[in-house]
C-alpha cells in the first residue's frame, strides 16, 4: 500500500473520530483533551486555558449562549448528606471518609471539626440521599473536598482557609470552623460569600470589609470535569488554591483525583473504590 493511500486513510480515520466526538456530544472532545493534559495544565497553563476559554464564558452565574458544553461535564451540587432514622453510616477506607444514608427527607450536614474530636452536625434541607466522600488535599488554602459518589461523582463542597479563617463553603452559606463546633458565619466576620456559577464551578466568593469600610473580594474554587472517553468513565477533580482563579491565569490548577470506571485514583496510587452501599 502506497504512502499516499496510508496517509489518506489515516486522515479519514482521524477526521471521522473527531467528527464522531463532536456530533455525539458537544464538549466531549474538549473534556477528553482536558483529561489528557490535566497533569501539565498547572505547569504550562496555556493549553488548558485555550481549551476552556471558548467554553467557559460565564460571569456571576449567567451562562452565555453557546456554553452548554460546560454544563454537560462540569457539575456542582450542595455540600450535604442525608441521614435516615438510624443516623448516618460512617465508612473509613484507604484515605477517604464516606457518609451515607439510604433514605431521608430532612438532613444534616455532617462535619468533622478537624481536630480529631467527635463529628457533629448542623441542620440542612436536601432533596435526596448522597454518598459523600471527603478527601484531604496536601497543599494551599483548600484542605478538603467533598465528592458525591452516589451517582454523578460531583464535587459538592470545599473546606478552605480564607483570610486566616477555616471555613466550609457550600451553595449560599458559609460555616466557620472554630475548633469547638460549627457555626453559621453571620456576625463573626464582616463578609459576604456566595458561589457562582452554581451549575459549572464551585466558586467561593468572599468580600471583606476593611477598617475604612472598603470592600475587597477574593475567589477560590474547585471544579469537577466528568466525561466518557473511548468507553471509559473518566472524572477529573480539579482545585485551585489561588485567588481569583476564574480569570484562567496560569499555574492555578492541581489534579485532585481521577475517577476511572468507578475507581477513584489519586496521583501515584489507587486509593479506594467507589462505595455504592446504602
From Swiss-Prot:
Origin: domain of life: Eukaryota
Keyword annotations of the record: Cell membrane, Glycoprotein, GPI-anchor, Lipoprotein, Membrane, Signal
Signal peptide: 1-20
GO annotations of cellular component type: endoplasmic reticulum; external side of plasma membrane
Predominant cellular place of this UniProt entry's protein: membrane
Protein name, entry field: Uncharacterized GPI-anchored protein C212.08c
Propeptide: 97-278
Compartments where located: Cell membrane
Membrane topology of the entry: Lipid-anchor; GPI-anchor
Organism field: Schizosaccharomyces pombe (strain 972 / ATCC 24843) (Fission yeast)
Residues linked to a lipid group, GPI-anchor amidated glycine type: 96
